[in-house]
């Protein structure tokens, strides 16, 4: 994907900017897998024709097959040892790919509060709402009865997550510019349209290095 950040306001310790970009269709949308003999015979009996190779479910296709616009708006307020902000955005699936469907659009609202413990360490809390729309259309080579992920009726959901994170910025001469972060997130509410696997807690660890 490619994106550009445009500053809209930067006064009185308040920053507002927008990100505008495009999600590019580099991932595959036609990945397949070979069936075992038992599954092969079962499908042959039900479908009436041979399926030695089966198209993977929608969630296992890493690409979208389309060029999709994405946009977000972010506002951050800075205080002495505290900052808070919110971001609203989305990835808009407006077009149909060559397999006959468009992937789910993704909309979100992310709000956070961050406090500096000292010049290197900060702690933050987040609240994230995500809305995933249903897949529009259908890939005729994906067999719905094989798994819930293969049925477009199960592709939509809404999710509310809460999280807490620690960030550490190194300031010594050797590791200057290196930032380490660890975040724990837990689902607060989850609404599924259809059948989906249960969502559990998750931990994310990341590193960022800035060249000055």
Question: Where is each model-derived feature located?
Answer:
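Outer membrane beta-barrel transmembrane domains
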Residues: 103-212
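Outer-membrane pore/translocation modules
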Residues: 1-98, 149, 212
